[in-house]
Amino acid sequence: MLIFKRSDQLPKKATQIFIPIIDGQVVAGQYDKDFEIDLQEQLAFFAPADKPIKAGEIFEIPISMPDHSCNRISMVSLGKAEPSELRLAGAAIGRKLRGKSELVFVAVNLKSTQTKALLISANLGNFQWSLKRDQKPSESQLYIPTDDGVISAAQVISDAVNRARELIHTPSNIKNPEWIAKQAKRLANGTKVEVLSGSALKEFGGLRAVGGSSPNPGPRFIKMTYSPRTPGAKHVVLVGKGITYDTGGISLKRPYDIMAPMK
Protein backbone atom coordinates (compact mmCIF):
# COMPACT_ATOMS: atom_id res chain seq x y z
CA MET A 1 0.00 0.00 0.00
CA LEU A 2 1.01 3.63 -0.39
CA ILE A 3 1.08 6.13 2.46
CA PHE A 4 0.77 9.70 1.18
CA LYS A 5 2.67 12.53 2.82
CA ARG A 6 3.29 16.16 1.98
CA SER A 7 6.73 17.54 1.14
CA ASP A 8 7.66 20.60 -0.88
CA GLN A 9 11.33 19.61 -0.84
CA LEU A 10 12.98 16.63 -2.48
CA PRO A 11 13.72 14.24 0.45
CA LYS A 12 17.39 13.28 0.58
CA LYS A 13 16.43 9.75 1.63
CA ALA A 14 14.10 9.24 -1.34
CA THR A 15 14.88 5.96 -3.11
CA GLN A 16 12.55 6.59 -6.06
CA ILE A 17 11.77 9.87 -7.83
CA PHE A 18 9.00 10.36 -10.38
CA ILE A 19 9.13 13.33 -12.76
CA PRO A 20 6.04 14.08 -14.89
CA ILE A 21 5.96 14.36 -18.66
CA ILE A 22 3.05 16.47 -19.91
CA ASP A 23 2.34 16.68 -23.62
CA GLY A 24 5.83 15.39 -24.42
CA GLN A 25 7.65 17.86 -22.17
CA VAL A 26 9.47 17.00 -18.95
CA VAL A 27 7.99 19.18 -16.20
CA ALA A 28 10.44 19.13 -13.30
CA GLY A 29 9.65 22.69 -12.21
CA GLN A 30 11.64 23.92 -9.24
CA TYR A 31 13.24 20.49 -8.84
CA ASP A 32 15.09 20.73 -12.15
CA LYS A 33 18.06 22.30 -10.36
CA ASP A 34 18.43 19.21 -8.16
CA PHE A 35 19.53 17.12 -11.13
CA GLU A 36 22.81 17.51 -13.01
CA ILE A 37 21.44 16.20 -16.29
CA ASP A 38 19.14 17.51 -19.01
CA LEU A 39 15.98 15.47 -18.50
CA GLN A 40 14.42 16.58 -21.79
CA GLU A 41 17.52 15.41 -23.62
CA GLN A 42 17.33 12.08 -21.84
CA LEU A 43 13.67 11.73 -22.80
CA ALA A 44 14.53 12.36 -26.47
CA PHE A 45 16.80 9.32 -26.34
CA PHE A 46 13.96 7.05 -25.19
CA ALA A 47 11.12 8.71 -27.07
CA PRO A 48 11.96 10.50 -30.34
CA ALA A 49 9.83 13.51 -31.27
CA ASP A 50 8.02 11.56 -34.00
CA LYS A 51 6.94 8.88 -31.52
CA PRO A 52 3.94 9.90 -29.37
CA ILE A 53 4.23 9.10 -25.68
CA LYS A 54 1.19 7.40 -24.17
CA ALA A 55 -0.11 8.24 -20.71
CA GLY A 56 1.28 5.79 -18.17
CA GLU A 57 4.56 5.14 -19.99
CA ILE A 58 7.59 5.29 -17.69
CA PHE A 59 11.19 5.93 -18.70
CA GLU A 60 13.83 5.17 -16.08
CA ILE A 61 17.28 6.75 -16.19
CA PRO A 62 20.26 6.35 -13.83
CA ILE A 63 21.52 9.43 -12.00
CA SER A 64 24.23 10.38 -9.55
CA MET A 65 23.18 12.59 -6.65
CA PRO A 66 25.89 12.59 -3.94
CA ASP A 67 23.64 14.16 -1.30
CA HIS A 68 20.66 11.89 -2.01
CA SER A 69 19.92 8.17 -1.67
CA CYS A 70 18.24 7.93 -5.07
CA ASN A 71 20.23 6.55 -8.01
CA ARG A 72 17.51 6.63 -10.65
CA ILE A 73 14.70 8.85 -11.90
CA SER A 74 11.46 7.61 -13.42
CA MET A 75 9.88 9.99 -15.91
CA VAL A 76 6.18 9.18 -16.15
CA SER A 77 3.89 10.44 -18.90
CA LEU A 78 0.66 12.13 -17.83
CA GLY A 79 -0.40 12.58 -21.45
CA LYS A 80 -2.13 15.96 -21.61
CA ALA A 81 -3.08 15.60 -17.92
CA GLU A 82 -6.70 14.76 -18.75
CA PRO A 83 -8.60 12.86 -16.00
CA SER A 84 -8.41 9.48 -17.73
CA GLU A 85 -4.72 9.99 -18.50
CA LEU A 86 -3.94 10.92 -14.90
CA ARG A 87 -5.58 7.69 -13.79
CA LEU A 88 -3.42 5.70 -16.21
CA ALA A 89 -0.27 7.46 -15.01
CA GLY A 90 -1.15 7.01 -11.34
CA ALA A 91 -1.86 3.31 -11.84
CA ALA A 92 1.51 2.91 -13.61
CA ILE A 93 3.29 4.50 -10.63
CA GLY A 94 1.43 2.21 -8.23
CA ARG A 95 2.26 -0.93 -10.22
CA LYS A 96 5.93 0.03 -10.38
CA LEU A 97 6.01 0.26 -6.58
CA ARG A 98 3.97 -2.90 -6.01
CA GLY A 99 5.59 -5.33 -3.60
CA LYS A 100 8.27 -2.81 -2.63
CA SER A 101 8.96 -0.66 0.40
CA GLU A 102 10.37 2.62 -0.82
CA LEU A 103 10.51 6.29 0.05
CA VAL A 104 9.08 7.98 -3.03
CA PHE A 105 8.89 11.57 -4.22
CA VAL A 106 6.53 12.60 -7.02
CA ALA A 107 7.53 16.02 -8.34
CA VAL A 108 4.23 17.23 -9.77
CA ASN A 109 2.70 20.68 -9.83
CA LEU A 110 -0.92 20.09 -10.73
CA LYS A 111 -4.34 21.35 -9.71
CA SER A 112 -5.76 19.80 -6.55
CA THR A 113 -8.31 17.69 -8.43
CA GLN A 114 -5.63 16.40 -10.79
CA THR A 115 -3.26 15.52 -7.96
CA LYS A 116 -6.03 13.70 -6.09
CA ALA A 117 -6.88 11.61 -9.17
CA LEU A 118 -3.21 10.73 -9.63
CA LEU A 119 -2.78 9.67 -5.99
CA ILE A 120 -5.97 7.63 -5.80
CA SER A 121 -5.03 5.73 -8.95
CA ALA A 122 -1.51 5.13 -7.64
CA ASN A 123 -2.78 3.42 -4.50
CA LEU A 124 -5.33 1.41 -6.47
CA GLY A 125 -2.61 0.32 -8.90
CA ASN A 126 -0.40 -0.68 -5.99
CA PHE A 127 -3.05 -3.02 -4.58
CA GLN A 128 -2.02 -6.64 -4.09
CA TRP A 129 -4.18 -9.34 -2.55
CA SER A 130 -2.89 -12.49 -0.90
CA LEU A 131 -4.47 -15.40 0.94
CA LYS A 132 -1.54 -15.34 3.35
CA ARG A 133 -3.22 -13.36 6.12
CA ASP A 134 -0.07 -13.31 8.26
CA GLN A 135 1.97 -11.74 5.47
CA LYS A 136 2.46 -8.04 6.12
CA PRO A 137 1.79 -6.05 2.93
CA SER A 138 4.56 -3.93 1.48
CA GLU A 139 4.32 -0.24 2.28
CA SER A 140 5.88 2.73 0.50
CA GLN A 141 5.91 6.33 1.69
CA LEU A 142 4.95 8.65 -1.17
CA TYR A 143 5.81 12.33 -0.72
CA ILE A 144 4.27 14.95 -2.97
CA PRO A 145 4.01 18.76 -2.99
CA THR A 146 0.30 19.40 -2.50
CA ASP A 147 -2.27 20.45 0.10
CA ASP A 148 -2.88 18.33 3.20
CA GLY A 149 -6.57 18.15 2.30
CA VAL A 150 -5.77 16.54 -1.06
CA ILE A 151 -3.51 13.98 0.61
CA SER A 152 -6.11 13.15 3.27
CA ALA A 153 -8.95 12.74 0.76
CA ALA A 154 -6.88 10.61 -1.63
CA GLN A 155 -5.72 8.37 1.22
CA VAL A 156 -9.20 7.81 2.63
CA ILE A 157 -10.84 7.12 -0.74
CA SER A 158 -8.16 4.79 -2.10
CA ASP A 159 -7.77 2.88 1.18
CA ALA A 160 -11.54 2.36 1.37
CA VAL A 161 -11.65 1.00 -2.20
CA ASN A 162 -8.75 -1.35 -1.51
CA ARG A 163 -10.40 -2.61 1.67
CA ALA A 164 -13.55 -3.36 -0.31
CA ARG A 165 -11.42 -5.24 -2.84
CA GLU A 166 -9.90 -7.31 -0.03
CA LEU A 167 -13.38 -8.26 1.17
CA ILE A 168 -14.49 -9.15 -2.36
CA HIS A 169 -11.42 -11.26 -3.13
CA THR A 170 -11.59 -13.25 0.11
CA PRO A 171 -13.20 -16.64 -0.73
CA SER A 172 -16.45 -17.60 0.96
CA ASN A 173 -14.95 -20.59 2.79
CA ILE A 174 -13.10 -17.95 4.84
CA LYS A 175 -15.65 -15.15 4.58
CA ASN A 176 -18.37 -16.63 6.78
CA PRO A 177 -20.74 -14.45 8.88
CA GLU A 178 -18.49 -14.56 11.94
CA TRP A 179 -15.50 -13.41 9.85
CA ILE A 180 -17.51 -10.57 8.29
CA ALA A 181 -18.59 -9.39 11.76
CA LYS A 182 -14.95 -9.30 12.87
CA GLN A 183 -14.01 -7.26 9.80
CA ALA A 184 -16.78 -4.77 10.56
CA LYS A 185 -15.34 -4.22 14.03
CA ARG A 186 -11.80 -3.97 12.67
CA LEU A 187 -12.50 -1.55 9.84
CA ALA A 188 -15.25 0.69 11.22
CA ASN A 189 -13.07 3.19 13.03
CA GLY A 190 -15.18 5.87 14.73
CA THR A 191 -18.34 3.83 14.33
CA LYS A 192 -20.25 1.89 16.98
CA VAL A 193 -20.62 -1.76 15.93
CA GLU A 194 -23.21 -4.09 17.44
CA VAL A 195 -23.29 -7.75 16.37
CA LEU A 196 -26.40 -9.87 17.02
CA SER A 197 -26.16 -13.66 16.99
CA GLY A 198 -27.70 -16.75 18.57
CA SER A 199 -30.81 -16.09 20.67
CA ALA A 200 -30.67 -12.38 19.81
CA LEU A 201 -31.83 -13.38 16.31
CA LYS A 202 -34.94 -15.17 17.55
CA GLU A 203 -37.29 -12.87 15.63
CA PHE A 204 -35.14 -12.83 12.47
CA GLY A 205 -36.82 -15.80 10.80
CA GLY A 206 -35.55 -15.23 7.28
CA LEU A 207 -31.98 -14.68 8.39
CA ARG A 208 -31.99 -17.79 10.57
CA ALA A 209 -33.61 -19.90 7.84
CA VAL A 210 -30.92 -19.03 5.31
CA GLY A 211 -27.96 -19.36 7.66
CA GLY A 212 -29.18 -22.04 10.04
CA SER A 213 -27.94 -25.02 8.02
CA SER A 214 -24.40 -23.71 7.66
CA PRO A 215 -21.65 -25.87 9.24
CA ASN A 216 -20.00 -22.63 10.34
CA PRO A 217 -21.17 -20.58 13.34
CA GLY A 218 -24.63 -19.24 12.61
CA PRO A 219 -25.72 -15.98 10.97
CA ARG A 220 -24.88 -12.52 12.22
CA PHE A 221 -26.79 -9.24 12.10
CA ILE A 222 -24.39 -6.31 12.11
CA LYS A 223 -25.57 -2.87 13.14
CA MET A 224 -23.12 -0.01 12.59
CA THR A 225 -23.97 3.42 13.98
CA TYR A 226 -22.19 6.66 13.19
CA SER A 227 -23.10 9.68 15.31
CA PRO A 228 -22.01 12.93 13.63
CA ARG A 229 -20.69 15.75 15.76
CA THR A 230 -23.20 18.16 14.26
CA PRO A 231 -26.47 17.97 16.25
CA GLY A 232 -29.70 17.69 14.33
CA ALA A 233 -28.13 16.04 11.30
CA LYS A 234 -30.48 14.08 9.06
CA HIS A 235 -30.71 10.35 9.87
CA VAL A 236 -29.58 8.06 7.06
CA VAL A 237 -30.07 4.28 7.13
CA LEU A 238 -28.15 1.99 4.77
CA VAL A 239 -29.24 -1.65 4.57
CA GLY A 240 -26.97 -4.26 3.02
CA LYS A 241 -27.00 -8.03 2.64
CA GLY A 242 -23.95 -10.27 2.80
CA ILE A 243 -24.44 -13.97 2.17
CA THR A 244 -21.88 -16.76 1.94
CA TYR A 245 -23.02 -18.14 -1.39
CA ASP A 246 -26.05 -20.41 -1.22
CA THR A 247 -26.02 -23.14 -3.89
CA GLY A 248 -29.53 -24.31 -3.04
CA GLY A 249 -31.80 -24.29 -6.08
CA ILE A 250 -29.06 -23.21 -8.45
CA SER A 251 -30.73 -25.17 -11.24
CA LEU A 252 -33.78 -22.93 -10.82
CA LYS A 253 -31.88 -19.65 -10.89
CA ARG A 254 -31.37 -17.78 -14.10
CA PRO A 255 -29.30 -16.95 -16.02
CA TYR A 256 -27.44 -20.16 -15.13
CA ASP A 257 -24.22 -19.23 -16.98
CA ILE A 258 -23.85 -16.24 -14.63
CA MET A 259 -24.93 -18.03 -11.44
CA ALA A 260 -22.55 -21.02 -11.76
CA PRO A 261 -19.27 -19.04 -11.52
CA MET A 262 -20.53 -17.40 -8.31
CA LYS A 263 -19.99 -20.72 -6.51
Kindly give the residue locations of the regions a language model identified:
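Short amphipathic alpha-helical segment within the helicase RecA-like ATPase core
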Residues: 1-242, 247, 255
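A glycine-rich phosphate/pyrophosphate-binding beta-strand-loop-alpha-helix module
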Residues: 248, 252-263
